Amino acid sequence: MAEPRRGDLWLVSLGAARAGEPGKHRPAVVVSVDELLTGIDDELVVVVPVSSSRSRTPLRPPVAPSEGVAADSVAVCRGVRAVARARLVERLGALKPATMRAIENALTLILGLPTGPERGEAATHSPVRWTGGRDP
């Protein structure tokens, strides 16, 4: 099996879905940093599931067929999770840098991570503001 890298698109066995989670076999983007994928703690891989839904928002950036999905899709950033490396079934492709930036921006918002000058300090709130409608 190929080694996963940050920005790769993999078919992942997520198992049965619960409470709105994406489930079953589906594409997912590897968002773990490469150093963690080859280090001591390499059994878990952090991924963002991908859905063929066309409901795009800043929290669901588009993923194009040229990046490895079968049809226009979205990265479901609110579904970010760690999975066992054994759940990675097959490498499908790699995302373009602009797509990864959109996913990183969404994760920054969802996780309340600091940006800019306050980076490195504990965040008490997200510096990025959600101004769009409902994110399903």
Swiss-Prot record:
Signal peptide: none annotated. InterPro entries: PemK-like, Plasmid_toxin/cell-grow_inhib. GO terms for biological process: mRNA catabolic process; negative regulation of growth; negative regulation of translation; rRNA catabolic process; symbiont-mediated perturbation of host process. Keywords: Endonuclease, Hydrolase, Nuclease, Toxin-antitoxin system. Transmembrane segments: none annotated. It is an enzyme of class 3 (hydrolase). Gene3D superfamilies: 2.30.30.110. GO terms for molecular function: DNA binding; RNA endonuclease activity. Its EC number is 3.1.-.-. Residues 115-136 are annotated as: Disordered. The keyword Hydrolase applies. Belongs to the PemK/MazF family. Toxic component of a type II toxin-antitoxin (TA) system. Upon expression in E.coli and M.smegmatis inhibits cell growth and colony formation. Its toxic effect is neutralized by coexpression with cognate antitoxin MazE7. Probably an endoribonuclease. Forms a complex with cognate antitoxin MazE7. This is Probable endoribonuclease MazF7. It comes from Mycobacterium tuberculosis (strain ATCC 25618 / H37Rv).
